[in-house]
A protein has these predicted regions:
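Short coil/turn segments at secondary-structure boundaries
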Residues: 151, 169, 215-218
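Active-site nucleophilic cysteine motif
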Residues: 177-181, 185, 216-231
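Extracellular adhesion/carbohydrate-binding repeat motifs centered on closely spaced tryptophans
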Residues: 1-155, 249-265, 273, 292
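Non-catalytic ligand/cofactor/substrate-binding and regulatory segments of enzyme domains
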Residues: 150-160, 181, 288-295
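Hydrophobic/aromatic-rich core segments of domains that either
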Residues: 222-291
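Low-complexity, Gly/Ser/Thr/Pro-rich intrinsically disordered linker/tail segments
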Residues: 282-306
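Short, basic/low-complexity N-terminal boundary segments at the transition from targeting/disordered tails
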Residues: 15, 105, 236-238, 304
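Secondary-structure boundary elements
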Residues: 155-212
Length: 306
């Protein structure tokens, strides 16, 4: 009788080899999960950090995924595409992300406010840098690309931007810029009574400002509207006053004649009176300095009061 005895040691070794433990490799680098990009370091997702992957910069926010569109990071706004790549580059340019358009510099930071770009188009970007599209703002219409309609309102805006740029600088305070705009209107406008605006027409204050700034001439309404347009351009909210002051030009029985000046924050500014020398020193004064009547006050920005 033959008896078979198992080699116990060899069997144990064979069993161990067949059930060897598989070691899972920890994630490192960029991974796309459920439509969002994440970055792993030693198997853990990172957050609130910049990372560069294959030459493209990403920012992984507080929820771990790469942020997209516009985001404020350490006090600055940056624009990213829909994959989370920072839209930086060699020069400033218009970029499109989804339905939004931005004008970003080489660091991916968008411009805000009014923009007159090298394509000869006027745009307006909100506080996040998004272009206004298919809407009207301050009587200027924007199309689906964010471009302003080419009309008198656009022409006035570009004219004001140019005058302010040529007569002020970034080191000036807001009040210093206002004085520079005042000096420009007073010194560069000659009096002409050939044109009186129709105060019943819509946007007469803007068309009058454009006429005066464009021709360098105007009556009291022209001076007032031109100064109000420039004041608005540097951030004030002026009113054009349509009133009457003592005078004989209109031949009215009560001894008053038509006149126009500007109110800013309740203070009076009379550029035509200054330029012509008949009522000087009315610059930011709490009182007008002579008796007057007010027919209406028109907010230059909104048109309220017209």
């Amino acid at each position: 009788v033959q008896v078979c005895i198992a080699d116990t040691a060899n069997e144990v070794l064979a069993a161990t080899a067949s059930t060897a433990t598989t070691v899972t490799k920890k994630k490192n680098g960029l991974y796309k999960e459920k439509g969002k990009n994440y970055y792993y370091t030693n198997g853990k997702k990172i957050k609130n950090q910049w990372k560069t992957v294959k030459g493209k910069k990403y920012y992984f926010g507080p929820k771990y995924y790469a942020v997209t569109y516009h985001n404020k990071i350490n006090g600055k706004i940056y624009v990213f595409d829909t994959f989370g790549k920072l839209l930086n580059g060699k020069k400033s340019r218009i970029v499109n992300v989804g339905k939004n358009s931005y004008y970003v510099n080489k660091y991916g930071i968008p411009s805000t406010g009014w923009l007159y770009l090298s394509d000869k188009n006027l745009y307006y970007a909100d506080s996040w840098g998004r272009f206004y599209k298919n809407r009207t703002y301050e009587s200027i219409k924007f199309n689906g690309k964010g471009q302003a309609a080419k009309n008198d309102m656009r022409t006035l805006k570009i004219k004001c931007m140019d005058i302010v740029k040529r007569n002020t600088n970034s080191k000036m305070s807001k009040s210093q810029k206002l004085r520079a705009c005042w000096n420009y209107v007073v010194r560069n406008t000659y009096y002409s009574s050939r044109y009186y605006p129709n105060l019943r027409q819509n946007n007469w204050w803007r068309t009058t400002a454009l006429r005066t700034l464009g021709t360098g001439s105007g009556n009291c309404y022209g001076y007032a509207c031109a100064f109000a347009a420039l004041a608005r351009e540097i951030g004030y909210d002026p009113y054009v006053v349509c009133g009457r002051v003592p005078g004989t030009r209109d031949g009215a029985w009560d001894g008053y004649t038509r006149h126009s000046w500007v109110l800013i924050n309740g203070y009076h500014y009379d550029p035509e009176g200054q330029a012509k020398g008949w009522h000087t020193g009315v610059y930011g004064t709490s009182r007008y300095g002579m008796s007057y009547q007010v027919q209406k006050k028109v907010n230059f920005r909104t048109g309220n009061g017209n």
